[in-house]
Amino acid sequence: MFGLKQFYQDEVRAKLAQELDIKNPMLLPKLEKIVISVGAGAHAKDMKIMQNIAQTISLIAGQKAVITKAKKSVAGFKIREGMAVGAKVTLRNKRMYNFLEKLIVISLPRVKDFRGISRNGFDGRGNYTFGINEQLIFPEVVYDDIMVSHGMNITMVTSTDNDKEAFKLLELLGLPFAKVR
């Protein structure tokens, strides 16, 4: 693989400085972290399934997943405080760029009828979140090893507080956004 971090340092930073008209290189937007999270939903009661979900995310990310717990009890959802409700992984630096490259080059092209990811996932503060419906698009996941099919949320946190700059950064890094109609 070419190395997305090297690509960012060599080419993307120069294009960003030119297109966004930023003179100070320290003010250029950069990717700070990627958070991969899964909510277990109805499967939260079964600890074996929770462990399987955490193991699957660990395989995908290349880093150990943390099982998230409920902060407070919600009777309507039959959730108690401290009960396992999902799993997440926070990726930074080398693992973050490796995951992003794998996502762009290998995983997203494996999505059936893929036409690009939505441009509507920006939160107004320069962060971008999108969802994946199935974990089987990742090459590390073996179909026979999963107990339940689940999707995941992927959040990309950037150093900028501007959605326009964050979009330009992610677009130059190669994220395949859907065409505007």
UniProtKB/Swiss-Prot annotation:
Pfam families: Ribosomal_L5, Ribosomal_L5_C. The keyword tRNA processing does not apply. GO terms for molecular function: rRNA binding; structural constituent of ribosome; tRNA binding. Coiled coil: none annotated. It comes from the Bacteria. GO terms for cellular component: ribonucleoprotein complex; ribosome. GO terms for biological process: translation. Keywords: Ribonucleoprotein, Ribosomal protein, RNA-binding, rRNA-binding, tRNA-binding. Belongs to the universal ribosomal protein uL5 family. Part of the 50S ribosomal subunit; part of the 5S rRNA/L5/L18/L25 subcomplex. Contacts the 5S rRNA and the P site tRNA. Forms a bridge to the 30S subunit in the 70S ribosome. PANTHER family: 60S RIBOSOMAL PROTEIN L11-RELATED (PTHR11994). This is one of the proteins that bind and probably mediate the attachment of the 5S RNA into the large ribosomal subunit, where it forms part of the central protuberance. In the 70S ribosome it contacts protein S13 of the 30S subunit (bridge B1b), connecting the 2 subunits; this bridge is implicated in subunit movement. Contacts the P site tRNA; the 5S rRNA and some of its associated proteins might help stabilize positioning of ribosome-bound tRNAs. This is Large ribosomal subunit protein uL5. The lineage of its organism: Bacteria, Pseudomonadati, Campylobacterota, Epsilonproteobacteria, Campylobacterales.
